[in-house]
């Protein structure tokens, strides 16, 4: 399976191409403040970043042939952790997102690029809005201010899985504190 992964961040767009588990390309495309200042809103960077991904693939001789394209999950409505296929409801949620961040571009770019390839599907994994809090963790000093979870779920879950693999333990069997 050939996969393109796209991770838009505040000042860069990271991409990687994998054939199964073998990396074929890992690239960090940096964006200067000057480049990004031309865009009034983060969402306006969509075409710019999408085109940079396509250019990077061409420059590195990677044919535009993928089975799946994975974008960094955006600031959607809260959902449990996992891998999700990009759908119309998700795209609409991002279009009307309460918060603006470059990560919102991930599923948009993945969906648009996947639509160009027959049989290719677009996904996100463990977006920053993963919400698996126990009810007691939602308690704040005021019922008027409910706790909202926004965290780097993708990174922290990956580190937990890596650590569990080093211990030859399944990560659900571990009790870890993410800081």
Where are these regions (language model features)?
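Conserved small/polar residues in nucleotide/adenosyl-binding loops
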Residues: 177-179
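Short, well-ordered amphipathic alpha-helical segments that serve as non-catalytic structural scaffolds
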Residues: 48-60, 159
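General beta-strand structural signal in soluble alpha/beta enzymes
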Residues: 68-71, 121-127, 170, 174-175
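Active-site glycine-rich loop that binds ribose-phosphate moieties when present
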Residues: 105-106, 151-170
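Short beta-strand-loop/turn "lid" adjacent to the catalytic site in phosphate-handling enzymes
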Residues: 57-102, 129-144
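A structural micro-motif
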Residues: 1, 64, 119-120
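Short glycine-rich, Thr/Ser-proximal phosphate-binding strand/loop in the N-terminal lobe
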Residues: 3-44
């Amino acid at each position: 399976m050939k996969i393109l992964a796209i991770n838009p961040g505040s000042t860069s767009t990271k991409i990687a191409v994998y054939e199964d588990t073998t990396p074929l390309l890992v690239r960090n495309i940096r964006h200067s403040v000057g480049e990004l200042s031309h865009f009034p809103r983060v969402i306006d960077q969509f075409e710019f970043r999408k085109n940079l991904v396509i250019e990077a693939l061409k420059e590195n001789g990677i044919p535009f042939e993928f089975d799946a394209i994975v974008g960094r999950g955006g600031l959607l409505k809260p959902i449990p952790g996992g891998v999700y296929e990009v759908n119309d409801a998700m795209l609409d949620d991002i279009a009307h997102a309460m918060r603006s961040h470059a990560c919102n571009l991930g599923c948009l770019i993945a969906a648009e690029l996947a639509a160009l390839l027959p049989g290719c599907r677009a996904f996100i994994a463990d977006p920053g809005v993963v919400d698996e809090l126990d009810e007691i963790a939602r308690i704040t000093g005021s019922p008027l201010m409910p706790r909202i979870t926004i965290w780097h779920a993708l990174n922290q879950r990956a580190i937990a899985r890596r650590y569990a693999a080093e211990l030859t333990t399944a990560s659900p069997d571990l009790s870890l504190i993410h800081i």
